[in-house]
Swiss-Prot record:
Assembly information from the UniProt record: A double ring-shaped homohexamer of ClpQ is capped on each side by a ring-shaped ClpY homohexamer. The assembly of the ClpQ/ClpY complex is dependent on binding of ATP.
Annotated catalytic residues: S2
Record: residues binding Na(+): G165, C168, T171
Keyword Hydrolase: yes
Enzyme class: hydrolase
Entry's family note: Belongs to the peptidase T1B family. HslV subfamily.
Official protein name in the record: ATP-dependent protease subunit ClpQ
Organism: Bacillus subtilis (strain 168)
Subcellular location: Cytoplasm
Species classification: Bacteria, Bacillati, Bacillota, Bacilli, Bacillales
Gene Ontology MF terms in the entry: metal ion binding; serine-type peptidase activity; threonine-type endopeptidase activity
Keyword Protease: yes
EC number: 3.4.21.-
Length: 181
C-alpha cells in the first residue's frame, strides 16, 4: 500500500482564523478501502503552520519533511518556503517524480503547492484538493458567503468535508480538523 488514491483536503481563512480539514479514508486501487482514520492534515513549525496533502503516502511524507526544512531555513516565511519547495520539487530529478499536492497555511497566508512548480494563493481564502475537492470547495464557498459571522472557520471546514463525504465515494466522514488562532 503506497498511495492515497483518493482524499479530500479543505482549508479556509475566516474571521481571523485559519482551519484545515481532511478525511481519513485510504483507498488502495479503485475498489478497496484500506484505512478509515489516516491523518492527512498536520501542524508544522511549532504549531504555527497547517499542511494537508493529497497523493502518494511516501511522497507526501517526503514533501512534509522538505517543506518543514524550508520553513526552518526561511524562519517561518510561508511564501518563501513554499516557493523554494516548488522550485526544488520541479527541478530535482527524484522530487519531480513525486505525486502529491499540498495545501499550506499560517494565520495570514493560504497556498496550494504542486509539483509542477505552481504556488497559488486563492482570492477568497479557500482551497480544496483531492477527489472530493470540488465538492468541498463549492460547499465551503457557499458557507463562507452565506453564513457570515454565524460560523467559525472550523465549522466551515468541518461542514465542507461532511458535504464532500456525502457525495464523493473516496471521501469518508472520519474528519481530522486543525485550527490556527
Amino acid at each position: 500500500m503506497s498511495s492515497f488514491h483518493a482524499t479530500t483536503i479543505f482549508a479556509v481563512q475566516h474571521k481571523g482564523r485559519s482551519a484545515m480539514s481532511g478525511d481519513g479514508q485510504v483507498t488502495f486501487g479503485q475498489a478497496v478501502v484500506m484505512k478509515h482514520t489516516a491523518r492527512k492534515v498536520r501542524k508544522l513549525f511549532n504549531g504555527k503552520v497547517l499542511a494537508g496533502f493529497a497523493g502518494s503516502v511516501a511522497d507526501a511524507f517526503t514533501l512534509f519533511e522538505k517543506f518543514e526544512a524550508k520553513l526552518e531555513e526561511y524562519n517561518g516565511n510561508l511564501k518563501r518556503a513554499a516557493v523554494e519547495l516548488a522550485k526544488e520539487w520541479r527541478s530535482d530529478k527524484v522530487l519531480r517524480k513525486l505525486e502529491a499536492m499540498l495545501i499550506v497555511m499560517n494565520q495570514d497566508t493560504l497556498l496550494l503547492v504542486s509539483g509542477t512548480g505552481e504556488v497559488i494563493e486563492p482570492d477568497d481564502g479557500i482551497l480544496a484538493i483531492g477527489s472530493g475537492g470540488n465538492y468541498a470547495l463549492a460547499a465551503g464557498r457557499a458557507l463562507k458567503k452565506h453564513a457570515g459571522e454565524s460560523m467559525s472557520a472550523s465549522e466551515i471546514a468541518r461542514a465542507a468535508l461532511e458535504t464532500a463525504g456525502e457525495i464523493c465515494v473516496y471521501t469518508n466522514d472520519q474528519i481530522i480538523l486543525e485550527e490556527l488562532e
